[in-house]
UniProtKB/Swiss-Prot annotation:
Lineage: Bacteria, Bacillati, Bacillota, Bacilli, Lactobacillales
Cofactor: Mg(2+)
Leader sequence segment: none
Residues that, per the record, bind ATP: S11, F12, H19, G91, L92, R93, E101, H126, L127, Y128, I129, S130, S131, S132
Pathway assigned to this chain's UniProt record: Cofactor biosynthesis; coenzyme A biosynthesis; CoA from (R)-pantothenate: step 4/5
One MF term in the entry's GO annotations: pantetheine-phosphate adenylyltransferase activity
Enzyme Commission designation: 2.7.7.3
Cellular component aspect of the GO annotation: cytoplasm
Listed name of the protein: Phosphopantetheine adenylyltransferase
Catalytic activity: (R)-4'-phosphopantetheine + ATP + H(+) = 3'-dephospho-CoA + diphosphate
Residues that hold substrate according to the record: S11, K43, V76, R90
UniProt xrefs under NCBIfam families: coaD_prev_kdtB, cyt_tran_rel
Location(s), subcellular: Cytoplasm
Biological process terms in GO annotation: coenzyme A biosynthetic process
Length: 162
């Protein structure tokens, strides 16, 4: 029997504790879980891709079956096929997230009907945490330590120094 391989994607700009929780839970469902950092042309970048990747790798270092990959100008289903993933993992905080994700699920299924999508609901303590909310707090100089993993906080501090 072949390994169960999943792919969880996002821009992770920055990664939050909500992302971390979904990844930790998803890692228990698969033999191998790829975490794909995707460039989102609809979002203005906050942290450079290299910083995001390094921060994620540190935050996820305790998960032996998880590997961080980065992608530019590729569809998620194409990356999934290339990596051998048969399942996309998505996190949901609310009904708006479900509606947003459902449209992508439709197209992904049209492009590759053998790739399934599973949704993991956010835990109550993470329902209102978002990367955009964290960026907004940072813009006004507020502390974000309770919203992001320590390694991400380090990357943000290092980027601010430069």
């Amino acid at each position: 029997m072949s390994d169960k391989i999943g792919l969880f994607t996002g821009s992770f700009d920055p990664m939050t504790n909500g992302h971390l929780d979904i990844i930790e839970r998803a890692s228990r469902l698969f033999d191998k879980l790829y975490v794909g950092i995707f460039f989102n042309p609809h979002k203005q970048g906050f942290l450079p891709l290299e910083n995001r990747k390094r921060g994620l790798e540190k935050a996820l270092g305790h998960l032996e079956n998880v590997e961080v990959v980065a992608s530019h100008d590729e569809l998620v289903v194409d990356v999934a096929k290339r990596l051998g993933a048969t399942c996309l993992v998505r996190g949901l905080r609310n009904a708006s997230d479900l509606q947003y994700e459902a449209s992508f699920d439709y197209y992904n299924h049209q492009l590759s009907s053998d790739i399934e999508t599973i949704y993991l609901h956010s835990r109550p303590e993470h329902l209102y945490i978002s990367s955009s909310g964290v960026r907004e707090l940072l813009k006004f100089g507020r502390d974000i330590a309770c919203y992001v993993p320590e390694s991400i906080l380090e990357e943000i501090r290092n980027e601010k120094k430069d």
